UniProtKB/Swiss-Prot annotation:
Class in the EC hierarchy, top level: oxidoreductase
Protein's UniProt name: Probable malate:quinone oxidoreductase
Stretches the record annotates as Disordered: 490-509
Annotated catalysed reactions: (S)-malate + a quinone = a quinol + oxaloacetate
Similarity comment: Belongs to the MQO family.
GO molecular-function term, one example from the UniProt record: L-malate dehydrogenase (quinone) activity
Organism, as annotated: Geobacillus sp. (strain WCH70)
Superkingdom of source: Bacteria
Keyword field contains Ligase: no
Keyword Disulfide bond: no
Cofactor: FAD
Record keywords, A-Z: FAD, Flavoprotein, Oxidoreductase, Tricarboxylic acid cycle
EC number: 1.1.5.4
Amino acid sequence: MSNRQTSTDVILIGAGIMSATLGTLLKELAPEWEIKVFEKLGKPGEESSNEWNNAGTGHAALCELNYTPEKPDGSIDISKAIRINEQFQVSKQFWAYLVKNNLLQNPQEFIRPLPHISLVQGENNVRFLKKRFEALSNNPLFQGMEFSDDPEKLKEWMPLIMEGRTSNEPIAATKIDSGTDVNFGALTRMLFDHLKRKGVEINYKHSVKDIKRTSDGLWELKVKDLNSGSVEIHKAKFVFIGAGGGSLHLLQKSGIPEGKHIGGFPVSGLFMVCNNPKVVEKHHAKVYGKAKIGAPPMSVPHLDTRYIDNKKMLLFGPFAGFSPKFLKNGSNMDLFASVKLHNLGTLLASAFKNFSLEKYLIQQLMLTKEKRMEELREFVPTAKSEDWDIVIAGQRVQIIKDTEAGGKGTIQFGTEVVSAADGSIAALLGASPGASTAVHVMLEVLKKCFPQHMKEWEPKIKEMIPSYGVSLAKNPDLFQKLHDSTAETLGLNEKEPVSGASEKELVYS
């Protein structure tokens, strides 16, 4: 064991989009604070933030039908859609601030304009989509959305999806041009480059093995240097656990009461990626369908144009897989290691009440490539098996906890901050909508953990995020002004992404 002991203001565990965002916010709000980052892998953004491990959708509820459920009376509830959209606007404002102040360059490397389309088939689903369109059209956040059930119009919007379609079943779509494709891996790497320039100490190949509270109120971390094998002790006044699927284990090690009675259930994702450049060129949108009855919200199928390494790609999915690992680079013992006496009852209750999810996962695990092609052909009738390959995406750990609404052992499909009562440590758990709402979620961390500084920080926060504390849905003029200015700064006004020679090449990694 090394004798090295250090003390610092802030330690961030995990070099993903969440730590990158929190570190960047803190460096703007309290530049004198000393920050250290510990990351188990050799570079930033290699787990859930990596562009191959998530869908790259700028989630703004423009096309994701699971954010607008139908109420028992048949009306559409758009409250969650408004919330998700406003949270994404916060992210865009912060990124625009960073670009405008030359803290980030070349925004087209991490965000591009891309139409977002919702697609449904069948009479009931068409009726639902029309009602959704009417409900959203009255809200300024969703202006510019179009609805069509005319096959000729749909051919213009999504030629690949309409090509070879012979079914007489009713079909309809909504389209909005203000959608985005976000490369969260590229953004994470850019933010960590920025933090390095700001003097943040970033330690790769360093694994946090234990976290405990010391008698003087600091947090003591036992950190293993994976290159040398030595173990170091690092102390901090504040610790943020942003380790993706690895956060639950570290939260449990901290021993805070707020981390008790929480379990995790890992789900892995698979996508199909097109290896035929001619097919890739026929599609230019993110097209989201409707989850099948009984399927969980994370199973919504979508056909996405993506830009990875500045190259245009086409992906379809997700398909679910199962691995007991909590991280793609984790251990097969992760799930078992997370089971404690305090969360055993919660996990058992969840196992009994979530048969539909378990059945769905078993069915997904049994899918052959040809069965997956059949699902793809519901979107792309002309899809040929030889044009598509399967890639394994990231691991997601769904939170399981006891809630008033859902009772014991309820699976939470969102993102959640768990923090100590005194605000000295916080962990981020959960999955969707994840990275798109990173700035909003990290502002929540600041509010929970640094309430004594919020008044003094507020003017700077409002400079970075002009809509801070304001509902954009209720302030259409402010929304329009900020929507236009962020689009200008981030280069989102192009109808078609800037076409370079390299974009015509197909990538498949």
